[in-house]
């Protein structure tokens, strides 16, 4: 049913979710891809003072107003989005992959942390992950973050900021990464689907740094039982985002490590999180896996 937000209210949504409302509803897209649909009347981009056409994609950080004599539907067209809105509205969820719930679930067991972005819980699911963010997730999935944070070993990379020095030093000492050049890690470069899938294969002991060609990492992950065929296709079909890092990491936890139990079993045994905390985190996600 319809609800009223008397002040701007924020929601993190997933693909296919719809926010709708009548005349007077104001909407700001804080992140992600969203379009607007309406059959009559007008929707105004208040930021530019212009009307937008039905079916148009909306610009981030512009304020949109549903004008007279219409009801507008704001639909999430990307994997995720963050909307801020004020006025009379209804939210209609779609049965799509719930990346936001997976991010929240991983946060409860300390495997995923937000950035200092002031919206969307800092999850930044709409952004491409950096190579450093991918490396830190690998270290967490290995259950080795506490060791990494106390590492004072040498690392040769000139482009690593102070806060990331322990992670880079630890990963270099353990042979987890060689950087993009002898003295460059590529800290702020985007991580690819192939790179992150290769990291997962290493965490699950199906690969190692001896594997230098990572171009077929998703396919190798499929043959190892780490990814489904649908997941390989999805990774190949769209830009790789932090939403995908969350998804792959979430399902890696229920995957068997080469020669042993599941990755979650390994992390529980290492004391990274408890069995009860893990079970509670899984209960937070109700969407289905991509087949």
Residue ranges: model-predicted function:
Residues 1-2:
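Boundary at the C-terminal end of the N-terminal hydrophobic targeting segment
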Residues 10-21:
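Conserved short histidine dyad/triad with adjacent acidic residue
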Residues 24, 29-42, 48-49, 78-79:
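Glycine- and acidic-residue-biased ligand/ion/polar-headgroup-sensing regions
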Residues 66-82:
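Ligand-binding loop in jelly-roll beta-barrel domains
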């Amino acid at each position: 049913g319809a609800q009223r937000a008397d002040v701007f209210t924020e929601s993190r949504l997933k693909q296919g979710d719809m926010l709708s409302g009548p005349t007077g509803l104001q909407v700001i897209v804080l992140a992600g891809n969203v379009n607007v649909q309406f059959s009559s009347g007008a929707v105004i981009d208040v930021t530019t003072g212009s009307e937008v056409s039905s079916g148009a994609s909306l610009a981030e950080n512009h304020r949109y107003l549903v004008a007279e004599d219409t009801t507008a539907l704001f639909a999430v067209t990307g994997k995720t989005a963050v909307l801020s809105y004020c006025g009379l509205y209804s939210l209609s969820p779609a049965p799509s992959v719930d990346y936001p719930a997976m991010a929240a679930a991983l946060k409860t067991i300390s495997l995923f942390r937000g950035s200092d972005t002031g919206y969307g819980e800092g999850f930044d699911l709409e952004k491409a992950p950096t190579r450093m963010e991918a490396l830190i997730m690998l270290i967490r999935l290995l259950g080795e973050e506490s060791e990494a944070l106390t590492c004072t070993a040498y690392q040769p990379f000139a482009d690593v900021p102070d806060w990331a020095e322990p992670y880079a030093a630890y990963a270099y000492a353990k042979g987890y990464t060689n950087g993009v050049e002898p003295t460059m890690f590529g800290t702020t470069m985007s991580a690819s689907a192939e790179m992150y899938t290769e990291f997962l294969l290493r965490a699950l002991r199906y690969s190692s740094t001896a594997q230098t060609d990572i171009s077929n990492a998703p396919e190798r992950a499929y043959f190892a039982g780490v990814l489904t065929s649908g997941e390989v296709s999805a990774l190949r079909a769209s830009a790789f985002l932090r939403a995908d890092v969350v998804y792959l990491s979430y399902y890696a936890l229920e995957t068997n490590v080469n020669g042993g139990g599941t990755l979650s079993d390994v992390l529980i045994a290492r004391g990274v999180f408890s069995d009860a905390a893990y079970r509670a985190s899984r209960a937070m996600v109700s969407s289905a896996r991509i087949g």
